[in-house]
Regions:
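Bacterial N-terminal signal peptides that target proteins for export
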Residues: 1-12
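Bacterial N-terminal signal peptides
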Residues: 10-20
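Intrinsically disordered, low-complexity serine/threonine-rich segments
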Residues: 3, 21-23
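Short, solvent-exposed cationic patches
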Residues: 122-139
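Primarily secretory-pathway and cell-envelope proteins
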Residues: 23-85, 134-172
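Mid-length scaffold segments of soluble, non-membrane domains
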Residues: 78-127
């Protein structure tokens, strides 16, 4: 009888440990969209792109944290100092300190420029202005108050919005 209770107790402990470990791993991988002082702490005041530094529009910035200290940060910048051809493709910056996917396409760790095009694409550019990724966006016609840039948490990641158009960012 004693042996049976010991086996049962050991089995229950193993089950509790495995379930709690799974919950901890899941909690570490969840996105949290930052706001307030948490947001201002991680968003840079300016961003370098194609030979110039432009100030960040803090009201049009957003960031998400996943895990203990992994971030995806985005913001629109004042592009008035850039040439017209650069302004046509570059709206802001996207910084990620871990590999992510955007609509299922992998993007490595780094700092990038981005722009949403009129034909429903999100274009990711390296700091020299070369396009390295282009994905189709989805229109969210149910959104009541679109903003120029924002992130919202969903079950499988974060929606990265420009107005009503969005792309899904997920951890890799």
């Amino acid at each position: 009888m004693y042996r049976w209770k010991r086996c049962l107790l050991t089995g229950l402990m193993a089950l509790v440990i495995s379930c709690s470990t799974a919950l901890m791993v899941n909690a570490q991988e969840q996105f949290v969209v930052l706001s307030g002082t948490e947001l201002t702490r991680v968003v840079p005041p300016g961003f370098y792109f194609q030979g110039l530094t432009a100030p960040t529009q803090m009201r049009n910035s957003s960031a998400a944290r996943f895990g203990a200290n992994r971030y995806v940060i985005a913001g629109l910048v004042d592009t008035s100092g850039y040439a017209a051809d650069v302004r046509a493709k570059y709206e802001g910056f996207l910084i990620t300190d871990s590999a992510i996917t955007i609509n299922g396409t992998e993007l490595g760790t780094g700092a990038y420029g981005f722009g949403f095009s009129n034909d429903g694409k999100l274009n990711i550019l390296d700091l020299a202005g070369n396009q390295i990724l282009s994905v189709s966006t989805t229109k969210d016609s149910a959104m009541k108050r679109p903003r120029p840039l924002m992130m919202t948490k969903v079950a499988d990641g974060v929606r990265f919005y420009n107005g009503r158009d969005y792309a899904l960012i997920a951890i890799k």
